[in-house]
A protein has these predicted regions:
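Glycine-rich segments within core transmembrane alpha-helices of 12-TM secondary carriers
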Residues: 141-161
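C-terminal membrane-cytosol helix-exit motif in multi-pass small-molecule transporters
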Residues: 157, 161-166, 185-210
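Hydrophobic core of transmembrane alpha-helices in multi-pass small-molecule transporters
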Residues: 24, 106-121
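Helix-to-loop junctions at the C-terminal end of transmembrane segments
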Residues: 66-79, 165
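C-terminal ends and interior cores of transmembrane alpha-helices
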Residues: 88-103
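Juxtamembrane intracellular "pre-TM" segments in multi-pass secondary transporters
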Residues: 1-13, 200-241
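Helix-loop junctions at membrane interfaces in 12-TM secondary transporters
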Residues: 13, 99-111
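Helix-loop boundary and gating motifs at the non-cytosolic
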Residues: 6-62, 235-242, 250-260, 264
């Protein structure tokens, strides 16, 4: 039993290292590309367009939708397969968005952003993967490591925007904002490889959580049923309202800040 405990502790430490590396890289990809999203909308629709926030809105909707898809896939196939699936879709979304930017195609750009949101969903779900093997009194600490790692990527990502722009323009002749999207897709490729090769064994499988709900006859509720349950519980309604208000505030600030800075010559 002691040896088993030691092995689990060692495996948890290794799992956290793998997830943190993925968080840093993926967070850099997300922050670099999403920062220029509003600029792309302005380039396509004009500087005075009232639709500058559509980029982050689409990205957020994609993240919300894919969170459901990836969570279900993880419950059946494990954390590694779910994260691989999410990062793969983010790579596809990044390349679609980059192609769309180069062609000034708004529909394609919106499509790419939606798929790109799966990268954010994967990063968020990584926090739960960090807790699979953690002791009950260490789960919050395990999640904090993932959050801490993502801050490095979030700070590092925007620094890459200018080099990516210059590289794309000088080497490939791309339009100004194409480079950051292609670079972000490449960063997600690294995150995908990191998870595919190093997140072994799967922490959810080791913890006994893989297919555990089906094994005891537990059925995941549909969205409508879940919303009705939330509606019937006061604290749940307050929690949901708080999350919605916080998300709206965050998206509004994130969208308009780069636009405001650009207008004042601080792009």
């Amino acid at each position: 039993v002691t040896q088993q405990v030691v092995d689990l502790v060692a495996l948890q430490k290794r799992t956290l290292r793998v997830l943190v590396v993925g968080q840093v890289v993926a967070a850099a990809a997300l922050s670099a590309a999403v920062t220029v999203g509003a600029f792309v909308i302005q380039d396509i629709l004009g500087q005075e367009t009232p639709w500058g926030g559509i980029s982050n809105a689409t990205f957020t909707m994609g993240s919300a939708f894919m969170s459901q898809v990836l969570a279900q896939k993880m419950s059946r196939k494990g954390r590694r397969v779910g994260l691989q699936y999410g990062y793969s879709l983010a790579i596809i979304g990044g390349f679609i968005a980059g192609f769309a930017v180069n062609r000034s195609s708004l529909p394609l750009f919106i499509l790419g952003l939606f798929f790109y949101g799966s990268g954010q969903a994967s990063n968020l779900l990584s926090r739960y993967a960090a807790m699979d093997l953690a002791a009950p009194d260490q789960r919050s600490q395990a999640m904090s490591y993932i959050l801490f790692g993502s801050t490095f990527g979030a700070v590092f990502g925007p620094v890459l925007i200018q080099p990516a722009q210059n590289f794309g323009i000088e080497v490939f002749g791309w339009s100004k904002y194409t480079g950051p999207w292609i670079a972000s897709a490449c960063f997600f490729s690294f995150a995908l490889i990191n998870v595919a090769l190093r997140l072994r064994p799967d922490p959810l499988e080791v913890s006994g959580g893989l297919n555990s709900q089906q094994g005891v006859g537990v059925v995941t509720p549909k969205l409508g049923a879940a919303l009705r349950t939330i509606k019937s519980i006061r604290n749940a309604r307050v929690a949901l309202a708080s999350m919605v208000i916080s998300q709206v505030t965050m998206v509004a600030v994130m969208t308009m800040t780069p636009v405001h800075l650009k207008l004042h010559g601080h792009e």
